[in-house]
């Protein structure tokens, strides 16, 4: 019998941090467990109205108030320091009557169209720091290109698992970990990690997601990331990005960049065959407080570009407020204009307007695909859709209301030639008010 050694993303991450540890200098002075502790409470008021224009059903209209309390301790003194983080979250329904649930900011109702009045969760994380390496175990807030918690609703998404990060070298960050469960942003309990667009067979789950990655920012204006992940028995997913900002002078800058994902089925292939290469290219011209960005995005493969359920791990330029423009073999273009009103004497006020157009052939999707058959459309030979997004945000700069943020978002999405098999014709409005409170 031949034994084989598999270099999983978690193994590679641990190996990558062992070498820096061996050469690390003396640990820098740190504050103690109590002295380095702090508590913050973020209040988030969230209203969403999703007006479905192509079907005769009630709109999804919900309004809620969220509270996120986060306590982070310092570390005990010594070469190896120990600490503890604790979080508690509460979501309250302010409005969401019969037939208007389903906006996704509140838990879904039990068939009566009414969301529950409240939902809550709490969790903790044990942490250990030695030199420039930090190990965490418990409930994690993750944010990287292959596993990122959704932050676009009233409460954040979290994961239960283990993570490891290292900052031994200037400009470099190494990380890795394993997550087995997730707390979705509109739920109280934990569940196994699924995917946003795939349908797993009944009574089956992926047991965990492993990841490893490295980030580089050691050259002024240049950033790059390389990540690998495995969603057990579903896929291997790899990611690379590169972006460089070149300042022509004090007023004008040029920023080209790219994002690339490769996704391949693995193990039991619970979602069926996957062989997907997706990339996006962008070029931004900044002139003072103005910027204009043009992007091109392409999905190569007869399955959509997919990522974890409710997550934000879709680091593609054309992922928008409503649609990700990630259909099988989809090509899309975007033009975006942004303005910072500090140029008119109103610091803290920013705006952006985007228009995106995409098209694909949904008849190429396998109607018998184990996980993605719902993407097949016999009328989708020349499927098209477009989206227009308007985003306005103001952050109070001083006084007692300092850091209070008000954000208005409006998305319009329209499809034709069979694309409604996936995305609906929708007008979506969001009003979000954040107020962070630093208790100590």
What is each of the regions a protein language model found here?
Residues 15-17, 21-142, 390-397, 405-440:
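Beta-barrel outer-membrane channel/assembly domains of diderm bacteria
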Residues 35, 61-67, 118-122, 156-160, ...:
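Residues that define the transmembrane beta-barrel architecture of outer-membrane proteins
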Residues 39, 78-81, 132-136, 171-175, ...:
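Repeated loop/turn-to-beta-strand initiation elements of outer-membrane beta-barrel proteins
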Residues 41, 67-73, 124-128, 162-166, ...:
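Residues on the lipid-exposed face of transmembrane beta-strands in outer-membrane beta-barrel proteins
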Residues 45-47, 135-149, 174-176, 212, ...:
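Transmembrane beta-strand segments that form the barrel wall of outer-membrane beta-barrel proteins
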Residues 71-104, 112-191, 214-218, 222, ...:
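Outer membrane beta-barrel
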Residues 92, 175-199, 203-205, 251-332, ...:
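Outer-membrane beta-barrel translocator/channel fold
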Residues 149-156, 182-184, 204-206, 228-239, ...:
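Solvent-exposed loop/turn segments connecting transmembrane beta-strands
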């Amino acid at each position: 019998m031949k034994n084989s050694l598999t270099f999983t993303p978690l193994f590679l991450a641990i190996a990558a941090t062992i070498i820096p540890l061996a050469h690390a200098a003396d640990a820098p002075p740190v504050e103690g467990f109590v002295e380095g502790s702090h508590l913050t409470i973020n209040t988030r008021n969230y209203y969403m109205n999703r007006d479905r224009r192509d079907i005769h059903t009630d709109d999804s209209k919900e309004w809620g108030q969220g509270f996120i309390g986060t306590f982070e301790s310092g570390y005990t003194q010594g070469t190896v320091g120990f600490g503890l983080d604790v979080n508690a979250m509460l979501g309250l329904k302010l409005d969401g009557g019969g037939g208007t649930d389903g906006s996704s900011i509140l838990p879904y109702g039990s068939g009566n169209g009414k969301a529950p009045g409240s939902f809550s969760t709490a969790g903790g994380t044990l942490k250990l720091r030695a030199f420039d390496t930090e190990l965490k175990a418990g409930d994690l807030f993750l944010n990287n290109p292959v596993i990122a918690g959704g932050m676009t609703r009233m409460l954040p998404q979290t994961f239960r698992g283990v993570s490891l990060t290292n900052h031994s070298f200037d400009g470099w960050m190494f990380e890795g970990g394993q997550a087995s469960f997730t707390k979705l942003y509109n739920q109280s309990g934990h569940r196994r990690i699924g995917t946003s667009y795939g349908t797993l067979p009944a009574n089956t789950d992926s047991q965990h997601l492993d990841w490893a990655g490295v980030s580089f920012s050691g050259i002024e204006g240049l950033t790059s990331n390389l990540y690998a992940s495995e969603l057990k028995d579903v896929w291997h997913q790899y990611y690379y990005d590169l972006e460089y900002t070149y300042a022509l002078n004090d007023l004008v800058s040029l920023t080209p960049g790219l994002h690339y994902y490769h996704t391949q089925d693995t193990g039991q292939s619970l979602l069926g065959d996957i062989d997907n290469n997706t990339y996006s290219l962008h070029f931004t011209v900044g002139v003072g407080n103005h910027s204009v960005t043009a992007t091109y995005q392409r999905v190569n493969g007869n399955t959509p570009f997919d990522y974890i359920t409710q997550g934000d791990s879709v680091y593609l330029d054309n992922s928008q407020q409503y649609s990700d423009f990630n259909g099988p073999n989809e090509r899309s273009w975007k033009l975006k204009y942004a303005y910072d009103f500090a140029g008119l004497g109103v610091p803290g006020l920013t705006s952006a307007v985007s228009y995106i157009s995409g098209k694909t052939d949904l008849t190429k999707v396998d109607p018998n695909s184990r996980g993605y058959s719902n993407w097949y459309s016999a009328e989708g030979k020349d499927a098209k859709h477009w989206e227009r997004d308007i985003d306005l945000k103001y952050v109070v700069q001083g006084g007692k209301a300092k850091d209070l943020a008000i954000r208005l978002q409006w998305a319009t999405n329209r499809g034709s030639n069979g694309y409604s098999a996936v995305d609906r014709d929708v007008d979506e409005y969001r009003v979000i008010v954040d107020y962070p409170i630093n208790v100590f």
